């Protein structure tokens, strides 16, 4: 017998930083880890959320709402949205992209499931809840760029730099976010398509990032430095690609401003 379920996005997550974040979720009788696996009873739930009732298998229901909860927990732990690169897509769908709709689908042989991108994983690595320490967690890194440059190399963009910081740094992440049609700016609801590219910080405090999967259009690079205490420092660069050729005029002005401060 079909079961009617009315549900309205029973989860919400937001992280101000590595020290402050929230995640709310609501439980119910149809949600369980076992519900992510094949259902021998083939239960169908008639689910109403933003539209009229539509049929969900028990597995799909748990994928969407447990996956959604974990996605929102990621926000509570200060993870932003991101999208799998072409190479990463072999692993499935990025959890902090649309991975809430694919979570544990591989258990039912319905797809590749979801995964944490390298960028998300490295940010969690130093989050106080995972590192097990709050030492210096409230201290400000006071990051400075001693060198910063960006340029195109064939079908990729290379970002290089040298930094210094009062809190040790472990990695630099470039969120490459294209401005979509009818999009205003690069606000949180418009960043699901931001691919991420990571460089560890060398012993000489240098980084070297190569961004691929280039597309025509206006772009924002959010250059995020990850510090050992869980903190992040963000700088923004903007560029345009037209017919495969990148224009860094605005980015170079922004680099000059970043380097001067």
Model-derived regions, located:
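Intrinsically disordered, low-complexity N-terminal regions enriched in serine/proline/glycine
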Residues: 7, 185, 191, 238-240
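Compositionally biased regions
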Residues: 7-10, 166, 260
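Serine/threonine-rich low-complexity intrinsically disordered regions
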Residues: 27, 39, 118, 193, ...
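Extended interaction regions within the primary functional domain
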Residues: 28-30, 34, 180, 188-190, ...
